[in-house]
């Protein structure tokens, strides 16, 4: 596993996995691929006779007396063939058809192996590494800057025993507040509770931690009837917001955190609409952050309310991200989604950050899509 020192804007050097190291590793691998392919191509040119062939050194042509002697002894045709057989022209070697087919097949197999190896290397890298993505947000009222670490969709993945590597990196980031975007557990896998509780307990020793439930926790809570789920989070030091607000005073600034529950289609059915209407009139805070697990919640409903920063996850970055195209698919938006990872401007002038998340999918592996730990610096 690569561990890199990554420079931050404040001059600190921290031991985290960075996009720079990922790009350097991929660049080295692809250079090896290109060199290998060029070597195969050059060797094939030599085998098929497409390259230069050594010329036969010209010999002295027979004179008239020699020609007459050859005609008298062997006939006219022999003299002509003898003359042309010693010409200085270069002959091309003919390659049998079976050899051409074999070489073409070898090239195809080699190219397929190289592409397959690159894909497998990409998948393996994404299973063991993550990148710290940094975002800079300007606030109108904050008197002193603060740092927020946002992590979401950690299920089906563990970074070191009990996520010790992830916790160590977060500790070195020195956040003022840690926010969770949901899906820390996997529906149907009760054994993942231990990892979730251990991670939350360790995070709560670094900074205040609060967050929302994801769709996996909702299924555990509503479908399996695990009414003690929120209590388990609370016991681990995490405040779970279910259409609720939490406030923190950081560097003499009051930060309001809104946590909206459920999915966009349930906005009017389970109290989210009434909750947002109730807190809309508040003004006694310096910064307001809104949390929702699903990013389309913001574009469909939440951008009609007042806050400066929105945070969401759920999409896993689209799972597969194509070069020059972006995320391939999400359940809410279908193919080529608009909100699957990155920062976006909302209609209320707020910034929406959609994290690619830290976890994995049980069906399709991440391809060209490194997991993300989001670091937001607000000034």
Regions found by a protein language model. Give the residues of each.
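Conserved beta-sheet core of the metallophosphoesterase superfamily
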Residues: 295-374
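Binuclear metal-dependent hydrolase catalytic cores centered on His/Asp/Glu-rich metal-binding motifs
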Residues: 224-238, 250-292, 298-300, 363-366
């Amino acid at each position: 596993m690569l561990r890199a020192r990554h420079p931050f804007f404040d001059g600190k050097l921290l031991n985290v996995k960075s996009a720079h190291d990922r790009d350097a590793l991929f660049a080295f691998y692809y250079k090896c691929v290109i060199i290998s392919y060029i070597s195969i191509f050059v060797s094939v040119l030599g085998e098929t006779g497409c390259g230069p062939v050594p010329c036969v050194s010209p010999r002295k042509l027979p004179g008239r007396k020699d020609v007459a002697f050859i005609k008298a002894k062997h006939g006219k045709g022999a003299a002509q063939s003898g003359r042309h057989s010693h010409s200085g022209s270069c002959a091309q070697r003919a390659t049998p058809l079976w050899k051409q087919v074999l070489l073409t097949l070898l090239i195809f197999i080699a190219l397929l192996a190289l592409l397959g190896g690159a894909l497998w290397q990409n998948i393996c890298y994404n299973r063991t590494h993550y990148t710290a993505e940094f975002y800079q947000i300007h606030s109108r009222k904050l008197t002193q800057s603060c740092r927020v670490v946002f992590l979401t969709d950690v299920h089906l993945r563990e970074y070191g025993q009990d996520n010790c590597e992830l916790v160590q990196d977060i500790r070195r980031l020195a956040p003022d507040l840690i926010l969770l975007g949901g899906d820390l557990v996997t529906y149907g896998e009760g054994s993942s509770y231990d990892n979730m509780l251990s991670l939350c307990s360790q995070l709560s020793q670094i900074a205040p931690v609060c967050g929302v439930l994801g769709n996996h926790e909702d299924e555990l809570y509503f479908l399996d009837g695990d009414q003690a789920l929120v209590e388990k989070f609370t016991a681990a030091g995490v405040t779970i917001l279910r259409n609720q607000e939490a406030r923190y005073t950081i560097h003499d600034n009051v930060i309001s955190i809104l946590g909206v529950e459920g999915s966009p289609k349930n906005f009017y059915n389970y109290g989210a609409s009434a909750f947002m209407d109730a807190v809309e009139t508040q003004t006694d805070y310096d910064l307001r952050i809104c949390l929702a697990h699903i990013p389309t919640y913001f574009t469909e409903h939440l951008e009609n309310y007042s806050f400066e920063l929105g945070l969401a996850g759920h999409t896993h970055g689209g799972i597969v991200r194509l070069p020059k195209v972006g995320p391939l698919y999400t359940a809410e938006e279908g193919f080529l989604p608009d909100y699957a990872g990155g920062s976006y401007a909302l209609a209320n002038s707020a910034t929406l950050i959609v994290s690619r998340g830290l976890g994995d999918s049980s069906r399709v592996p991440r391809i060209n899509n490194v997991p993300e730990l989001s670091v937001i610096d607000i000034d």
